[in-house]
Amino acid sequence: MSKPDVAQVKAFLLQLQDEICRGLELADGAGHFVEDAWRREGGGGGRTRVLRHGAVIEQGGVNFSHVHGDAMPASATAHRPELAGRRFEAMGVSLVIHPHNPYVPTSHANVRFFIAEKEGEEPIWWFGGGFDLTPFYPFEEDVRHWHQLSRDLCQPFGTDIYPEFKSWCDRYFFLKHRDETRGVGGLFFDDLNRWPFADCFAFMQAVGKGYLDAYLPIVERRKALAYGEREREFQLYRRGRYVEFNLVYDRGTLFGLQTGGRTESILMSMPPLARWEYDWQPSAGSPEALLYSDYLKPREWL
């Protein structure tokens, strides 16, 4: 295996954060990201950037973090006892965009790198990440575009990669207590070290760079569509599922809180507004009902 180049990964992630913020600001047309640079007492720090009350984006955050320490947290060593007693570095870019317009889907992306080292032993490293889409209203062409781009960026790495990571995404972003997916999926991968370092890094870069190509055309298509109170209420209700997933299931949230990560940055993914309603059911034949019947379960889109 080729030797991991931590500095190269960090440089890419910082540049990626800049590029994504620039692209989202252009798509929004009015809002700007405000940066909050922070340091972690145990080692490391990051740049949290938040855009609020934009023309398109109600609230969005793009976070870069790089944390390191002398010992792994319990959440990481529970499944990987070989990591115990190793110093570690974890770095990544994660983002969530919550648009105003209910016809524009919420999107999430994350790319990350992890390495654990011990004197006299080979380092243990891997990449993880992916992106996923959470529409509130069903537009099949948007979902097909999202998945087509996902498949295209996986293609150079093998024809089996898209089906594998697409399926992983469907399984990961699943709310067991609701028996529904969080959205329509995309790609999800973790523990990626099956190829030499350079190839694994290239795949992570392709996913990171692919996010804007996947999301911005959908934003452009939907951001000017007229909507009313009914659509807004449904959007806020569905955002409740986003909150449920992030607080109950998301491994990144758990890891961040257990490593003494920065709470404001970890919970940046939360929507600014959400609502719950007891035993709400969609009307038969409505677009909302179609979302439930055809979109909130794993399916082949291509």
UniProtKB/Swiss-Prot annotation:
Keyword vocabulary terms for this entry: Cytoplasm, Heme biosynthesis, Metal-binding, Oxidoreductase, Porphyrin biosynthesis
Stretches for region Important for dimerization: 242-277
PROSITE patterns: COPROGEN_OXIDASE
Residue positions binding substrate: S94, N110, V111, R112, G260, G261, R262
Compartmental location: Cytoplasm
EC number: 1.3.3.3
Gene3D superfamilies in alphabetical order: Coproporphyrinogen III oxidase, aerobic (3.40.1500.10)
Pathway given in the UniProt record: Porphyrin-containing compound metabolism; protoporphyrin-IX biosynthesis; protoporphyrinogen-IX from coproporphyrinogen-III (O2 route): step 1/1
Biological processes annotated in GO: protoporphyrinogen IX biosynthetic process
Sample GO molecular function, one term: coproporphyrinogen oxidase activity
Biological function: Involved in the heme biosynthesis. Catalyzes the aerobic oxidative decarboxylation of propionate groups of rings A and B of coproporphyrinogen-III to yield the vinyl groups in protoporphyrinogen-IX.
Family from the record: Belongs to the aerobic coproporphyrinogen-III oxidase family.
Protein name per its UniProtKB record: Oxygen-dependent coproporphyrinogen-III oxidase
Organism in which the protein naturally occurs: Aeromonas hydrophila subsp. hydrophila (strain ATCC 7966 / DSM 30187 / BCRC 13018 / CCUG 14551 / JCM 1027 / KCTC 2358 / NCIMB 9240 / NCTC 8049)
Source taxonomy: Bacteria, Pseudomonadati, Pseudomonadota, Gammaproteobacteria, Aeromonadales
Gene name for this UniProt entry: hemF
